[in-house]
Structures are given as C-alpha cells and as structure tokens.
C-alpha cells in the first residue's frame, strides 16, 4: 500500500452516530399516522440504508404513491431535527485530531444527500475539519460506484490509492476497491445481526474508532 495521505469516512454509522435522530424522525412519522413507535434497537441497524429502508420498515404494506408521500414527510421531519442527539462516535474526535496531527487529510463520502449532509456538519461544527465532502448527489453516481470515491480523492488532492476508506456497509468496501482504495469495515456501525461483513472482502476492520490509529501509523508519518 502506498504511503497513506488521506482517510475518507462514510457518514452514518461510521463517523457520526446519527441513529437517534433518524429513528426519532421515523417514530414521529409513525405517531403522525396513528401507528405504534418502533423500538430503537429494531431500527438502528437499518439506518445506513437510508430513509427509504426506514420508511419501508415502518410502513411495509403501503402503495408506492403513498410510500413516496410518507418518505417525503419523513425527510421533512428529519431535516428539522438533524442534530438533536447525533454526535461523533466515541473516540472519533481523537482520531480526527490524530489524522490532522500526522499531516494527513480527511474527508467524507456518503450516500446521504447534500441538503442533509451539509447542514448536519455545520450544526455539529465539523465542516472545516474535512478536506472534502462528497454527498449522494454531488456526482452522478453513488456508492458502490467508484465515482464519488475518485471525486473525493481529487478534491483532497491525493491519488486514490493513497486514501484509506472506512465504512460500515458492503457498498463501502465495493466502492473503495473499485476506486483502488483499501477499505476498513467499521463493525461498531449499523451492521445487522448476523451480517457476514467478513465476506465483503475488506482489508481489515475496526471495532471502535480508536482502532484506526495503528493504520495511521502505517502511513509512515507517525
């Protein structure tokens, strides 16, 4: 692996613990529709799959046109409560400081749309900490396509092969490898029970953010 020059992160379930607010928005939508809220633990592990999967969980039987309306309402609710409980995962602030201290760049590549990603980062005071932010609508393709990964590397000013990507879904590994980047699986993220993440072919895994530190030392800039 070439000398590491940048670390790129998935957003939901890797960099940020967004589940409390995303689950909260779903339960508010359910309440509006006179339905029983879902237990947090039943919803958390689907958060990485986005609003469509969450609304489908809450309303599995509705017709497509009704579903589209419910998803629109869900996004309205969530957009108004992006950062009530969302925070960096424990230890991630120290990891970002370690990346900065080694003279490496950091960035975000997420399938979350920019109209949600940018306000969320701004509300948490994180925008300036990243050399690049590529959202789900920044380029014409999303993960697992390589395009957003390559775009992030270009924005960060480093070759793709000098980037390390960290994510909690199979599409993260697929996108990174398609772009020529090594990928780590964040097993602390929103994996579903029994999900065989080892079959994704990642280059390693981290059970907590601080487990990323030894990988930074391999950059040769420790």
Describe each region flagged by the PLM.
Residues 164-204:
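Acidic, Mg2+-coordinating phosphoryl-transfer loop and its flanking beta/alpha structural elements
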Residues 15, 134, 185, 205-206:
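A structural signal for hydrophobic residues in beta-strands of small regulatory alpha/beta folds
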Residues 111, 137, 169, 187-190, ...:
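Short secondary-structure boundary segments
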Residues 2-94, 100-102, 113-115:
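N-terminal helical cap/lid subdomain that shapes the substrate entry/recognition surface
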């Amino acid at each position: 692996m070439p000398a590491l020059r940048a670390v790129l992160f998935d957003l939901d379930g890797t960099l940020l613990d967004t589940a409390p607010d995303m689950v909260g928005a779903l339960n508010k939508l359910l309440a509006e529709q006179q339905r029983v809220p879902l237990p947090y633990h039943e919803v958390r592990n689907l958060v990485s799959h986005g609003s469509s999967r969450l609304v489908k969980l809450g309303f599995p039987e509705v017709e497509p046109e009704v579903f589209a309306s419910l998803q629109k309402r869900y996004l309205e609710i969530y957009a108004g409560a992006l950062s009530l409980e969302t925070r960096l995962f424990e230890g991630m602030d120290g990891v970002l400081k370690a990346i900065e201290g080694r003279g490496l760049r950091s960035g975000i590549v997420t399938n979350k749309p920019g109209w949600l990603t940018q306000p969320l980062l701004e509300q948490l005071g994180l925008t300036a900490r990243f050399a690049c932010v590529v959202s789900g609508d920044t380029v014409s393709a999303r993960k697992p396509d390589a395009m957003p990964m390559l775009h992030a590397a270009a924005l960060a000013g480093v070759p793709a092969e000098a980037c390390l990507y960290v994510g909690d879904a199979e599409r993260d590994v697929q996108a990174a490898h398609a772009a020529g980047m090594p990928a780590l699986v964040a097993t602390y993220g929103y994996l579903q029970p029994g999900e065989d993440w080892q079959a994704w072919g990642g280059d390693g895994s981290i059970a907590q953010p601080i487990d990323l530190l030894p990988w930074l030392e391999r950059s040769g800039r420790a």
